[in-house]
């Protein structure tokens, strides 16, 4: 895996955790909002997998953040 891919994957993982905890949500809560399981959300946050782009887009809308923010490209 390329270094840039690893950086983006880690940024997404951290942003997902940050957005969820900043909003006082559980992984179950997030899963319900986007129609995914708690296990899927946990897998993303552990860096085992990534949400697809459509799911990441829906999360960015829910959290009122840009896709660039979710990918670690802006503060």
Regions picked out by a protein language model, each given a short descriptive name:
Residues 69-75:
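Short amphipathic recognition helices of helix-turn-helix/homeodomain-type DNA-binding modules
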Residues 27, 38, 48-49, 67:
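The DNA-contacting recognition helix of HTH DNA-binding domains
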Residues 21, 35, 46-48, 75:
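Residue-level detection of the helix-turn-helix DNA-binding "recognition helix"
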Residues 23-43:
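Short alpha-helical DNA-recognition segment
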Residues 54-69:
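DNA major-groove recognition helix of helix-turn-helix/homeodomain DNA-binding modules
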Residues 20, 31, 60:
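The alpha-helix within a helix-turn-helix
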């Amino acid at each position: 895996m390329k270094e840039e891919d690893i950086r983006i994957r880690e940024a997404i993982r951290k942003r997902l955790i940050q957005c969820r905890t900043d909003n006082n949500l559980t992984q179950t809560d997030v899963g319900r909002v986007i129609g995914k399981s708690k296990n899927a959300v946990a897998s993303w946050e552990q860096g085992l997998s990534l949400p697809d782009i459509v799911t990441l887009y829906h999360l960015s809308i829910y959290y009122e953040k840009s896709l660039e923010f979710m990918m670690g490209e802006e503060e």
